[in-house]
Amino acid sequence: MIGMNRLIFSKAFTSSCKSVGKVPFAKSITRANTRYFKPTSILQQIRFNSKSSTAPNTEANSNGSTNSQSDTKKPRPKLTSEIFKLLRLAKPESKLIFFALICLVTTSATSMALPLMIGKIIDTTKKDDDDDKDNDNDDKDDTQPSDKLIFGLPQPQFYSALGVLFIVSASTNFGRIYLLRSVGERLVARLRSRLFSKILAQDAYFFDLGPSKTGMKTGDLISRIASDTQIISKSLSMNISDGIRAIISGCVGLSMMCYVSWKLSLCMSLIFPPLITMSWFYGRKIKALSKLIQENIGDMTKVTEEKLNGVKVIQTFSQQQSVVHSYNQEIKNIFNSSMREAKLAGFFYSTNGFIGNVTMIGLLIMGTKLIGAGELTVGDLSSFMMYAVYTGTSVFGLGNFYTELMKGIGAAERVFELVEYQPRISNHLGKKVDELNGDIEFKGIDFTYPSRPESGIFKDLNLHIKQGENVCLVGPSGSGKSTVSQLLLRFYDPEKGTIQIGDDVITDLNLNHYRSKLGYVQQEPLLFSGTIKENILFGKEDATDEEINNALNLSYASNFVRHLPDGLDTKIGASNSTQLSGGQKQRVSLARTLIRDPKILILDEATSALDSVSEEIVMSNLIQLNKNRGVTLISIAHRLSTIKNSDRIIVFNQDGQIVEDGKFNELHNDPNSQFNKLLKSHSLE
């Protein structure tokens, strides 16, 4: 619909052109380029517990099974393919978009017909005034205007039809806006769900290296899920509508301008080449700047998430000022990038506005001369100027459409980077086995963490653990004890060698099904916000109350849970007032694992925060599980109280080699054993 400014302009122009004298100066009002403020959110990230640290500018030292992680730079895709790739994201909403476009065409048709109608109304009114002056008839019949026909209709019928047309236009405009907003919200919801699901399906290589080769951090992933998807949604919903509307308005407006006056149209068309060229260069620059801004926002979110998670450490070391300084640096990076965009946008829109104003003045001057020559009527010039405003606005709108499209492509590149990244380890392929029966064997294992290719962990490692055995892995920090659990859980695949359970190589098994048979408790367990019961049911959703109580008893968590005001319904998590101690968290985490009834239980310093009494009770319960149910127990420990409860001790040296293997008493009684050397060096407590 035409805004009030255009109606005011047409009235002022009509009154001034009756005498074909002085022409008032008309200011063109350009639309402000508003930025879209993106919402932020905090998502809980599930990260695999890897002992590796992410180092920049490193690459995976893998078995070469994946070509997608090649270090060779991919060729830059063509702009056309990038646009079609972006548009394909909206394919599921194609029906809604189709109906929205029908509403858009209807609204645009009504709007584009209005200038011609206004011109005819002006000419009809002017003709009446001229007739009155010629006839000097002051007692004009009141019914005379009704006899004047506008587009073949009497004036009452014409204005009634015009009112109906306005109602239809308003209704279709409502439908357009509602449908496109619906498309945008559906699109962003689907993208966020798809991205989150894709991230959870990734392996540890993704977090250690990822598409960037420097590792994927939680803050950057949050930015891509929350911010980039919003930009894409805007680019594919309202922006597409604005672009199509600009095309329709521009084409129809140009056609009607040619119909009214081809001479004025020729003058108007001279501004199109420079405007289109400027828009093209501006869009290319904006695309790069938009991607840079989104990357800066990702870096800031990453720093925010990291520092807020460690606020107690920051306060302990009194480093608030230095942390704020580093955070301000991230804000400064975003500010500088945004100011570059602001300067570019200011130059682009101010130049376009200047060209538009000069063009309008030129058209008015030339139009008044054509009226004086009798080639145009006042109504024709009014219609032409309104169509000129429409066409000029459409050209500017196309520039803004192209700009927003480039922003969408910049954000889509970061989203596609995650969507198209293929994990090295599939979660769904492979066979499913009902039971994990047999011994665990590591045969000729070579392994290096992908983020530390220069530091090998294992070289030709051979390890045999019998089914139902209670084994403890000991050694100095960094000797590869936790890496054994990482490989057994298949967070990583070895570069060489195989890992078998019975006759099954674990790489041949369905990963999700395989992990459902394992139990893994970390030294620093992650408990989700919610109740204690909800956290335990995370291990087994359909667990009965009897199974929950049994798991609580085995982990000795029932000892403190029953003293809580709300028992199992007690809210826990960082956002709640009820906080658990380290030992209590470990016991809840152990209960969450034991409720799955795993056949292989891996404890990575799982009782390190427990007091001696609680640890003794928990270890006694786990030993009973080992003896009565045949659960294979693999402990990784530095505490002597945990080590001595194991049937077999496997000692690693700093190079990741097994140097001793035997019972606790045998190794402890040998004064020259590596085990005793670890005790003397206080590597074991």
Curated annotation (Swiss-Prot):
Residues binding ATP, per UniProt: G475, P476, S477, G478, S479, G480, K481, S482
Primary localisation category: membrane
GO cellular component: mitochondrial inner membrane
Localization in the cell: Membrane
Record's bilayer topology term: Multi-pass membrane protein
Coiled coil: none
One annotated GO biological process: oligopeptide export from mitochondrion
One example GO MF annotation: ATP binding
Domain of life: Eukaryota
Membrane spanning residue stretches: 96-116, 158-180, 266-282, 353-373, 381-401
Record domain ABC transmembrane type-1: where: 97-407
InterPro entries: AAA+_ATPase, ABC1_TM_dom, ABC1_TM_sf, ABC_transporter-like_ATP-bd, ABC_transporter-like_CS, P-loop_NTPase, Type_1_exporter
Glycosylation site positions: N63, N239, N336, N553, N576
Acidic residues bias: start-end ranges: 129-141
CDD domains to which the protein is assigned, alphabetical: ABC_6TM_ABCB10_like
Family annotation (SUPFAM superfamilies): ABC transporter transmembrane region, P-loop containing nucleoside triphosphate hydrolases
ABC transporter domain ranges (all copies): 440-680
Sequence similarity: Belongs to the ABC transporter superfamily. ABCB family. Mitochondrial peptide exporter (TC 3.A.1.212) subfamily.
Matching PANTHER family: ATP-BINDING CASSETTE SUB-FAMILY B MEMBER 10, MITOCHONDRIAL, ATP-DEPENDENT PERMEASE MDL1, MITOCHONDRIAL
Protein name: ATP-dependent permease MDL1
Organism of derivation: Candida albicans (Yeast)
